[in-house]
Structure formats: structure tokens, C-alpha cells
């Protein structure tokens, strides 16, 4: 019986110490024709959620420099989400309002 206790305790300890970091969701608010915060830093696997808090205006999130197509427009009280799997710096802007800019930085 004692021969089984130590291996079982060792396995339980190893399982308990190998926690996997849970992916996080970071919120960027769109209001008054601005992305707030304008710059965010996340880890690979994290999600950015853009929330449109305007009263009447639609927006989009476009990673044009990365060669992406423009995301669908989203209207007040709607959201757009994107998961970032690779490290790097990803500038973006609003398609209909190119003066609205932001940057997502992804690093370990």
C-alpha cells in the first residue's frame, strides 16, 4: 500500500503544477471616433473584443498592412472579436474612418 502512495502523490503534484495559462479577452471601446485604449499588448491566444459604444455610427477594424480584408461593419452595441495567435505588432484602422487607428502588440 505504501508503495502506491508516493507515486500517486507525485503524479497529483505534477498535474497540479502544470497549469496552462487561460487565454484572456481584452476590450477596446469605440466611442467618439476613437479606439480606447489605442494600443494594447496581449499574449498569443488572447482575444481582442472591440465594442461599438457610439450612438449612431458604424465602424470596422481593418488590419490592412497585414493584407487582411476589412472586417464587416458593426453598429452601436455590436462587437467584433479577433484571436491573435502569433507574436508581432499589428496596426489597424477603421475602414470608413481611417483617422481612427490602433495597434495590437502580441508577445509571450
List PLM regions with ranges.
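Bacterial N-terminal signal peptides
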Residues: 7-16
